[in-house]
A protein has these predicted regions:
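Substrate-binding/active-site groove segments that recognize
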Residues: 22-48, 55-66, 151
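A cross-kingdom marker for long, charged
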Residues: 159-162
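Catalytic and substrate-binding regions of cell-wall glycan-acting enzymes that process beta-1,4-linked
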Residues: 79-157
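Secretory-pathway/luminal and periplasmic proteins that interact with or process carbohydrate-rich
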Residues: 17-26, 67-73, 90-105
Length: 164
């Protein structure tokens, strides 16, 4: 278990697949949680089970937990979650680059909103993706920027509407 509110995981699933277990992205990600085939294998999804909702959620939570360990230096758990969500979408390397850029340019590398997310967007400009602190090159960050914001907004709606 990752220890996240189930409504946050549901928000991620909705954003990824609109709860459609049969969907395949343009990049080849499959199923409810839109895992890339290689990631699905590494996270334990058996061959041919990519579209199984339970397998997809289990693998996604293992993957999220693994990424969360990479951000253990971020003290605030809500902030850490933003970085994990961004990495789920973008790949961890681009997020590490954006953190390095934020630090270099005087922003808080442990805060997502108005800090690191800004550099995710700027990684589409050569003066940023060619910066010596970047290791992963060009990145079109608008999708990731919106991804985190939309999941957080949907999670807030779910928390408001679904009382436990």
């Amino acid at each position: 278990s990752i220890g996240w509110d189930w409504k946050l995981l549901a928000s991620l699933a909705y954003k990824e697949s609109n709860f459609d277990t049969s969907v395949v992205s343009w990049a080849g990600a499959k199923g409810l949680m839109q895992l890339m085939p290689r990631t699905a294998r590494i996270m334990g999804v058996p061959e041919g089970k990519e579209y199984n909702a339970e397998e997809s959620v289990k693998a996604a939570t293992r993957y999220l937990k693994l990424m969360e360990k990479s951000f253990k230096s971020i003290p605030d758990p809500d902030e850490r979650t933003n970085f994990v969500l961004a990495s789920y979408n973008a790949g961890i390397g681009h997020i590490f680059d954006a953190m390095a850029l934020a630090e270099k340019y005087g922003h808080d590398k442990y805060r997502w909103i108005d800090n690191v997310e800004k550099y995710v967007l700027l990684k589409s400009k050569p003066e940023y993706y060619n910066d010596s602190v970047c290791r992963n090159g060009y990145f079109r960050g608008l999708e990731t920027y919106n991804f985190v914001r939309e999941i957080r907004a949907r999670h807030n709606i779910y928390k408001e509407k679904i009382k436990e």
